């Protein structure tokens, strides 16, 4: 067993104080907003489709989907304890403790969602992961995969804060690997600034001004920056299977 496998086997025990939150209501609100502001515009055509979440954790995303009327929901995760919580949260009996590679080989979906999982997969398995996602989608199906953004100002933290992180992506490299199989590929910022309150609108405005100032400073230094998404902590690829 590799060091990564040992940590993943005891992931919640070893990293629980870093990744868990006691405020379940706040955590659910975060996923409700993430879905509403970042995902919904891409997935609204799949409300009647068969949907899989890879790495469904404690069911926050699935619960958010239920709140918007999505019903044909499936989830997989390696943590049995998290799945137990997810089942209680969502009432779904379609959640399984299963490896993504195994599940994708034998099932078909219209929409596949995956947040903060791909970076944990070994680099020499990354292409296989994308290929299995492609093969598992029905014609017209879509995959949305979210990962940490290596162009972010604090990207070193995202890359190395977790020993089990195997690879990091920028918007260019994320598009590269998905275009090996998908013809329709776009990469978007997965911003965590949700404009749903006066306070957050003010923060968003201040953030916009700060980003412009940083870009200007980098131009003065001769470093460009017009093509670097340094202000976004995460990015998401939206890939559609047209044929």
List each language-model region with its residue ranges.
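Short loop/turn segments at strand-loop or loop-helix junctions that form parts
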Residues: 115-117, 147-148
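Short acidic capping loops at alpha-helix termini that bridge into adjacent secondary structure
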Residues: 72, 140-141
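Conserved N-terminal segment of class I S-adenosyl-L-methionine
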Residues: 1-107, 111-115, 124-130, 189-192, ...
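Active-site micro-motifs of SAM-dependent methyltransferase domains
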Residues: 102, 119, 152
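S-adenosyl-L-methionine-dependent methyltransferase catalytic module, highlighting the catalytic core
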Residues: 2-34, 78, 122-136, 142-242
């Amino acid at each position: 067993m590799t060091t990564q496998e040992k940590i993943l086997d005891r992931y919640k025990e070893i990293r629980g104080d870093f990744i868990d939150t006691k405020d379940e209501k706040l955590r659910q609100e975060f996923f409700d907003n993430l879905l509403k502001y970042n995902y919904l515009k891409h997935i609204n055509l799949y409300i009647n489709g068969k949907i899989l979440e890879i790495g469904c954790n404690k069911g926050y995303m699935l619960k958010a989907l239920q709140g918007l009327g999505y019903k044909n929901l499936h989830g997989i995760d390696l943590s049995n304890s998290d799945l137990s919580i997810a089942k209680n949260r969502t009432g779904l009996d379609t959640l399984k403790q299963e490896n993504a590679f195994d599940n994708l080989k034998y099932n078909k979906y219209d929409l596949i969602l995956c947040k903060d999982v791909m970076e944990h997969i070994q680099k020499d398995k990354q292409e296989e992961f994308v290929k299995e996602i492609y093969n598992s989608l029905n014609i017209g199906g879509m995959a949305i995969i979210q990962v940490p953004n290596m162009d972010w100002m604090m990207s070193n933290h995202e890359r190395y804060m977790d020993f089990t992180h195997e690879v990091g992506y920028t918007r260019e490299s994320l598009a590269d690997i998905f275009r090996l199989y998908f013809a329709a590929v776009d990469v978007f910022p997965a911003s965590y600034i949700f404009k749903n309150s006066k306070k957050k609108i003010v923060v968003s405005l201040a953030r916009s001004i700060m980003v412009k100032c940083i870009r200007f400073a980098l131009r003065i230094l001769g470093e460009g920056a017009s093509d670097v998404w340094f202000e976004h902590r995460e990015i998401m690829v939206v890939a559609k299977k047209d044929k």
